[in-house]
Curated annotation (Swiss-Prot):
Keyword set includes Nucleotide-binding: yes
Gene3D superfamilies: 2.40.10.170, 3.40.50.11180, P-loop containing nucleotide triphosphate hydrolases, Penicillin-binding protein 1b domain, Transcription-repair-coupling factor, D7 domain
Entry's EC annotation: 3.6.4.-
Recorded GO MF terms: ATP binding; damaged DNA binding; DNA helicase activity; hydrolase activity
All residue ranges annotated as the Helicase C-terminal domain in the record: 777-933
EC category name: hydrolase
Organism: Rickettsia prowazekii (strain Madrid E)
GO biological process: regulation of DNA-templated transcription; transcription-coupled nucleotide-excision repair, DNA damage recognition
Positions bound to ATP: 604-611
Name recorded for this polypeptide: Transcription-repair-coupling factor
Transmembrane segments: none
CDD domains linked: DEXHc_TRCF, SF2_C_TRCF
Length: 1120
């Protein structure tokens, strides 16, 4: 065994140097934690131009887990194993040391199952579909997640690790093209010369592996377990949650990760050896815990393999590592001679002269290749600006071999600490700018978030503008003049049916509730209700506009920023701002400096950086140059959140000379009185408070900015007090799930809206399960969290439920400790319990919903919610947001009583929360909340009843129209009619093109929202890109939509065609006399004027020319 020493920060550089000098040799670099493995992999891609560098990730589940790992991780592991076995050249593999213990499929397995595709190769869609299913890919209606594929027309879309989307276009029996596409937008981005597809899982379900599973299952567990759902799923060729824990049963033998390389040299340190031993202890503990849990329930369908069946022993792996050719590394910070010569760390200590020190070092080392390594784009840009100010030349690089001498090279490289060698000097921006955690790129933009809301399901209540509330039954095709046409079938009172052509789908709106009374077709009751509500909406709209106008009339002195101090404050931010954060900050800056009062809502998920955005706003105002003693008030709903914000503000604003105080129930009456006096005199710059701040005795000296955090938690009287402040104060509201009233005002443009939808780097979605209470699953969940070193929340809706929960926990997990917190305890006692939970003095916090705001504990990542059906949608969402806030996956279990019948309303809430798992879905939740409860009375606070008359979507539309009317904005005004067009053509989306009914309805709804010809053409391009060439029936539909847009312009209410020409009927209130007379004069031999605003145009027509003919007719009418 060879031993080497060098600075820890140079580990990857050292490994790459070895790898580069021995290109035919395989290497494994094993490290002690997953984060380091991924970072070293990214560094290696920079340091080396060799493509044979691979990363093998660890599962994000625990040993003997009943849940499956993240699909991206599973696919990435399989992809890496495939590349290792199919690539004969020298390779470098980077991984967590514990992965060396994994038993993996035999090493020859992946060489049989990978696919290499390229344009012009002979391959049919059916052949590829069958092979993908056999390779553990899941066929779906649309491909969104890793390991999924979708068949659409002549196209197969597939999602591979990254995640990256690929679109394979077929022509008969060969592949025509392969393109990469954006998973969010589904739009192609570039062509690919070839595509290698590895199995999507380490377990491939085919006749051979299923046969092995049957035999090995019988050998290990003695019986077939034909009533076992896991067993039944596997022998049927279906995946089952957690079946990865039985991997050895699927193969005749297993290999280790080392076996996948050719006599590799293993590079490791003592921490790696320790990680191997710790993992062995961990999986042995989990085995004992799982065995104990299995005894609690008869016929548990997760049989438990022994540790030696699932893993290699630590002693065997350690012995392998210590063989003579392997390298044990240790670290020193002083200069060391090594294979790469003189490596040493650089330390920047004098922070006040950091950049002067930097350029002294650069001057002394200008004979070397100097590389400044930035972690993210924002710091990269900052460093670039600084270099320019010092008048140095710089060179932007992506790989080390692009570096030049006699210039400063800069690149985005994840390096932690500076170091130098004989040839290179590496300097990190993290030391220069004191950066810490990074953020990833934008995950979902506003457009995508809003598109998620646009769904319509069979059986849902809908509203027709003219006929009222009905129930959408299904899409149904009928023949009209011998041609198929898609219609929406709507059920009305008395079993009456209404069929709406899909090109007029915009007249159908979602009702937004599970409870509704069907209207009767032909009844005048609907129009009376609609007219009555329209008058009330007019009153509301007028009032809202007056409020908004009053605020705009209150001219505010533009805030003059202290730019030098503000730049310093921004530079102290320990993260890199996300794109959405920067957009929100710029929005606020514009609001504060434009001379009008700000009224803005920031909607962003928990942990997505709303607080920092608010702090920027606070700084802009509190340090403004043109205000005398400006004050900022931050209002929060709970004492816990108040304390948390106060601590963060004190730390963040340190050194800027601002006096910050908090006012809540933990503050004594005497101290509170002093704070109020200081507020009134202007001595306090920033006050953070709960409802204690909303007191009639609270007076401000010069309140310029009011920030309302978690605004959905404030009650009527509290908001009345806030209203009294708002008419002369800038207002910024923040929420993950805004109350429907605030959301409505934002969506109608009366309140400005900024959305932060960018998750932190490596944030994983919280896995959410809705289930009857099951003690075995609860025990498993709590022990899983305990054994991975974390803590758990157990939430009770009511204090009286806590006694039962305590009894259950004593029986289920007697080995774990717990404490209780609820609102009837004194604030000091709650603080004491919370402080102990923060530092990990006990395992489980049993609490009421008081934790839904203000709790941020990275180690607490499991939550059980008792009687979840009794909680509101936004409450459930906020509670779930307490977990999974770091880089560890969170697990939420929403339990319901097994013997209780759940109402359809409650069930809908639970379905929404379970399905809204994507990061940044708070806006979606708020909109669903509006669907369920209604936007309510926008002037007062009642959130029920009024919207019931017409439903959410139509109410929203009527309000927008009324506001537009009052503001003389004609853009969104309601059309007085909807053109009906009958050209005798087949009009529908064929099942062969889009087979999924829900997706098809979503596309129809999008078509209903197209408002001009350019939008139609863009939509058409998107469809061709996603699904292939348009079938004639779909093309007819889009052509008719364009014709319909022309009909709006010409006030044509009906357009019918026959063999001998067209019949046009104009809208009764439209004055088209001049146009008609001019047209008749020009085409006197072909036209006739009929009663009831009808115009007949005579011309022999054939199907293939009818679209062209009608377009010529309408454009002629338009241009006359």
């Amino acid at each position: 065994m060879i031993q080497q020493k060098f600075p820890a920060t140079a580990k990857c550089f050292y490994v790459i140097d070895n790898f580069t000098k021995n290109l035919n040799q395989d290497f494994i670099l094993s490290v002690s934690n997953e984060e380091e493995a991924l970072q070293l992999y990214k560094q290696a891609l920079f340091f080396s131009s060799n493509d044979n560098i691979y990363y093998f990730p660890s599962y994000d589940t625990i040993p003997y887990d009943h849940t499956s790992p993240n699909a991206n991780i599973v696919s990435r592991r399989a992809e890496t194993l495939t590349k290792l076995i199919t690539n004969s050249k020298g390779k470098l593999l980077i991984t967590h040391a514990a992965n060396l213990l994994n038993k993996l499929p035999p090493k020859d397995f992946f060489s049989k199952y990978f696919l290499k595709l390229y344009p012009k190769i002979k391959f049919t869609m059916d052949e590829l579909s069958m092979l993908l299913v056999e390779n553990s890919f899941t066929r779906n209606t649309s491909s969104i997640d890793v390991g999924e594929f979708a068949v659409r027309g002549e196209i197969i879309d597939i999602i591979l690790p990254g995640p990256k989307g690929y679109r394979i276009n077929f022509s008969w029996d060969y592949i025509e093209s392969i393109k990469e596409f954006d998973i969010n937008t589904q739009i192609s981005t570039k062509y690919c010369a070839e595509l290698v597809i590895s199995p999507a899982n380490e377990i491939v379900l085919n006749s051979e592996t299923i046969g092995n599973f049957k035999n090995n299952y019988l050998r290990n567990f003695g019986v077939n377990h034909t009533d076992n759902p896991l067993y039944e799923a596997v022998i049927s060729g279906r995946k089952f949650a957690g079946y990865e824990q039985l991997l050895p049963l699927f193969y005749y033998s297993c290999s280790s990760l080392v076996d996948y390389l050719n006599n590799p040299i293993c590079i490791f340190d003592n921490l790696s050896k320790q990680a191997i031993l710790e993992f062995e202890n961990s999986y042995n503990d989990f085995y004992l815990a799982r065995s104990k849990a299995n005894k609690l329930k008869v016929n548990n369908f997760y049989p438990t393999l022994s540790p030696t069946s699932l893993y290699f022993t630590a002693s065997a792996i350690t012995e392998l590592l210590e063989q003579k050719n392997n390298i044990l590394i240790s670290y020193e910070n002083s200069e060391q001679a090594s294979l790469i010569g003189n490596i040493s760390s650089i330390s920047f200590i004098e922070k006040k002269t950091i950049f002067d020190k930097l350029f002294e070092i650069i001057k002394a080392n200008f004979h070397k290749k100097i590389i400044i390594c930035s972690s993210v784009l924002s710091s990269f840009e900052r460093i670039k600006s600084i270099i320019q100010n010092y008048e140095y030349t710089f060179n932007e690089i992506n790989k080390l071999d692009e570096a030049k001498a006699s210039v400063i090279n800069i690149g985005i490289i994840p390096l932690n600490q500076s170091f130098y060698t004989k040839e290179y000097l590496f300097i990190t921006s993290s030391e220069l700018l004191e950066e810490k955690t990074l953020y990833t790129n934008t995950n979902k933009k506003l457009k995508n978030i809003l598109l998620e809301l646009d769904n319509l399901k069979e059986g849902e209540f809908v509203v027709h503008k003219d006929h009222g509330i009905g129930q959408f039954l299904k899409l149904e095709a009928f023949k009209i003049q011998g041609k198929l046409h898609d219609f929406l079938k709507i059920l009305y009172f008395g079993n009456d049916k209404l069929y709406v052509p899909v090109e007029n789908i915009e007249v159908i709106k979602k009702y937004g509730s599970d409870n509704a009374e069907l209207n009767k077709l032909g009844s005048v009751a609907w129009n009376k209700s609609k007219a009555k509500l329209k008058n009330r909406i007019k009153e509301i709209s007028l009032h809202l506009i007056q409020i908004a106008a009053k605020r705009k009339l209150n001219i505010s002195t533009p805030i003059e920023l202290d730019l030098e101090a503000y730049d310093k404050f921004c530079a102290n931010f320990p993260f890199s701002e996300t794109e959405d954060q920067l957009t929100a900050i710029n929005d606020i800056r514009e609001d504060l400096t434009n001379g009008m009062l700000m009224d803005r809502l920031i909607c962003g998920d928990v942990g997505f950086g709303k607080t920092e955005v608010a702090m920027r706003a606070v700084f802009m105002v509190a340090k403004s140059l043109n205000e005398y003693l400006p004050q900022v008030a931050v209002v929060v709903p709970t004492t816990i959140l108040c304390s948390q914000h106060f601590s963060r503000f004190i730390e963040r604003f340190k050194g800027f000379g601002l006096n910050i105080k908090q006012l809540s129930s933990v503050i004594s009456s005497k101290e509170a009185n002093i704070i109020r006096l200081e507020l009134a005199s202007g001595k306090i710059n920033i006050i953070i408070g709960t409802h204690a701040l909303l007191h009639k005795n609270t007076k401000f000296f010069n309140l310029k900015l009011l920030i309302i955090d978690e605004e959905q938690h404030f009650g009527v009287s509290q908001k009345e007090f806030l209203k009294s402040l708002k008419s002369s104060t800038h207002v910024l509201a923040m929420s993950a799930t805004p109350i429907p009233r605030t959301l409505q005002m934002s969506m109608t443009g009366l309140k400005e809206l900024s959305i932060i939808a960018t998750p932190p780097l490596n944030r994983l979605e919280v896995r959410t399960s809705v289930m009857p209470f099951d003690p075995v699953i609860i025990r498993d969940a709590l022990l899983r969290e305990h054994f991975r070193g974390g803590r758990s929340f157990y939430v009770a809706p009511r204090i009286k439920d806590m006694e039962d929960i305590e009894k259950q926990l004593k029986q289920i997990v007697p080995e774990l400790s717990y404490k209780i917190a609820h609102g009837k305890m004194t604030p000091s006692k709650i603080d004491e319990v919370m402080s102990e939970f923060y530092v990990g003095k006990f395992d489980i916090l049993i609490s009421t919903t008081i934790i839904e705001s203000g709790i941020d504990i990275a180690e607490a990542n499991t939550m059980i919610i008792h009687k979840a059906d009794t909680l509101g949608l936004s409450q459930l969402y906020q509670l779930r947001g307490r977990i999974g806030r770091g880089k560890i996956r969170g697990y939420a279990y929403l339990t319901v009583a097994s013997n209780k019948k759940i109402t359809s309303h409650s069930l809908r809430r639970l379905e929404i929360i379970q399905n809204s798992c994507s990061l940044g879905s708070g806006f979606t939740i708020a909109s669903h909340d509006a669907d369920l409860r209604g936007f309510g009375n926008l002037i007062g606070e009642e959130q029920s009843g009024q919207i019931k008359e017409v439903g959410t979507e139509l109410y929203q539309e009527m309000l927008e129209e009324q506001i537009a009317l009052l503001k003389d904005d004609p853009i969104v005004l309601e059309q007085a009619f909807i053109p009906n067009i009958n050209l005798g053509l087949s009009v529908f989306i064929p099942d062969s093109y889009v087979s999924d009914s829900a997706l098809k309805i979503g596309l129809y709804r999008r078509i209903g929202n197209l408002s001009n010809e350019m939008e139609v053409e863009k939509f058409k391009d998107e469809m061709i890109d996603r699904f292939g060439l348009l079938p004639i029936e779909f093309n007819n539909l889009l052509d008719i939509v364009k014709i319909k847009l022309l009909c709006f312009k010409l006030n044509i209410e009906n357009l019918d065609s026959g063999d001998d020409g067209f019949v046009i009927r104009f809208y009764k209130n439209a004055d088209m006399t001049d146009k008609i007379l001019k047209f008749v004069s020009r085409y006197s031999n072909q036209t006739k004027i009929k009663p009831n605003n009808k115009l007949v145009f005579i011309k022999k027509l054939v199907d293939k020319n009818i679209i062209t003919e009608v377009n010529q007719l309408l454009w002629t009418l338009l241009e006359i």
